[in-house]
Amino acid sequence: MEYEVIIGLEVHVQLNTNSKIFSTATNEFGGSPNTHISPLCVALPGTLPVLNEVVLEKAVRAGVALGCEITKFTKFDRKNYFYPDLPKGYQISQFDKPYATKGGIHVLLKGEKEEKFIPLTRIHMEEDAGKLIHSHDPSINRSYVDYNRAGTPLIEIVSEPDLRSSDEAYVYLNELKTILRYIQVSDCNMEEGSLRCDANVSIRPKGEKGFRTRVEIKNLNSFKAVKQAIDYEVEWQKDVYSRGESFKQMTKLWDATLLKTIPMRSKEMSHDYRYFPEPDLPTIQISDSFIEDIRKTLPELPRQKKERYKTELGLPEYDAEVLTSEREIAEYFEEALVIAGDAKKTSNWVKDEILGIVNKENISIQEFAIDPVRIGKLVKLINSGEITGKIAKTIFEDMLTTKDQPETIVEKNGLKVVRDDKALEEIVIRVIESQPESVEGWKNGKDRVLGAIVGGVMKETKGKADPKLVNELILAKLGPLGEKKKV
């Protein structure tokens, strides 16, 4: 039987504010256990929450960027459950009045021409819980609680169950991460827990309406893990149905070592959490002017930027994709382009030479040794014909280890293109005379021999000869292809 895969994703994103969502405690990853805490973080009696306005601002910023409808009146609720990393015995979250609804993300699968729109159900704000640290010493059967993370501001972005494959889920997450980093509400660093994802997976026979029993998968600490877990779970559910059996709604953990999902508990429903309005926080009114002020500060988003690169700058799809993959890369490219004046040449240098080093050394483009202004000047020198592409790579190597401007390196090392017709003509004659077999090949109609002669001239001039002038001089000496002309 052929099945259709149904996937919905819940993505938790930590907001990059200076302080936590309801207290003045530092919002910072790492540090010694229980050092970034306040009395509220550990639920000391008498402490009361106060909403951090910057959290609301960044949350709305994310909602606007994702095309959501921002709720004019929103509130917080208590989500009641017991766990050692939740000292209050409840989490402050949002239940029936999330601050943002609808919206969505466009995804484009590799090899596809048409984008697919993945709608969102909602985005809500909530506080993060603490973290359990388990002893690795088998003789010490003990776990410790670090409350540094407790109270960290989160937004939970919930998609509609409209994803139909692990590939779609992977692309969706990448697009979401790119947007959130563009608008600078989070670094989305999965290794530090800034972005965490739960996947809800079910399958149904093709053509069947309605949804079957779903499984929620947790402990997905990379996009690769999300893809692997979904693929495994789909096959597991197919196997269950093929045997004529069924299963209960449940939560599973992804085991990255065994590469399988493992049952954790039966899946709770909303009534299990006994939600009720948070009595210590007032209803929040979000004005139209507040939303519009935020909308005006949004940068050009990656999808729009990519389209502009293709239509206005004439860049290929691949170039536009690479250059807009991170806001910092796009900014580097655009700053270099202002000086260089040639989009394609600038793109080639950024995506091939620069990102090649950035990826190899596992650094960010902000840490790259050469600033965009110097790269722009280098490309401009190539464009003006003052240096060749080959010489540019030599200059680039110097620029990696010095702060010198490219034009300074050119002058200091005498690297300008040779345009002296007489001097070049003498070199051309000398090279032609040293390659009688190439001359014979040309006379016999073999045009590929031209490259050997050009290469000889470039070698003699150490790559400094004007390639266009060299070609003209050689062709003038050789005559038309296939013609038995005396050279």
From Swiss-Prot:
Pfam families: GatB_N, GatB_Yqey. One of its GO terms (biological process) is glutaminyl-tRNAGln biosynthesis via transamidation. One of its GO terms (molecular function) is ATP binding. SUPFAM superfamilies: GatB/YqeY motif, Glutamine synthetase/guanido kinase. Transmembrane segments: none annotated. It catalyses: L-glutamyl-tRNA(Gln) + L-glutamine + ATP + H2O = L-glutaminyl-tRNA(Gln) + L-glutamate + ADP + phosphate + H(+); L-aspartyl-tRNA(Asn) + L-glutamine + ATP + H2O = L-asparaginyl-tRNA(Asn) + L-glutamate + ADP + phosphate + 2 H(+). Keywords: ATP-binding, Ligase, Nucleotide-binding, Protein biosynthesis. Its EC number is 6.3.5.-. The keyword Nucleotide-binding applies. It is an enzyme of class 6 (ligase). It comes from the Bacteria. Heterotrimer of A, B and C subunits. Belongs to the GatB/GatE family. GatB subfamily. Allows the formation of correctly charged Asn-tRNA(Asn) or Gln-tRNA(Gln) through the transamidation of misacylated Asp-tRNA(Asn) or Glu-tRNA(Gln) in organisms which lack either or both of asparaginyl-tRNA or glutaminyl-tRNA synthetases. The reaction takes place in the presence of glutamine and ATP through an activated phospho-Asp-tRNA(Asn) or phospho-Glu-tRNA(Gln). This is Aspartyl/glutamyl-tRNA(Asn/Gln) amidotransferase subunit B. It comes from Leptospira biflexa serovar Patoc (strain Patoc 1 / ATCC 23582 / Paris).
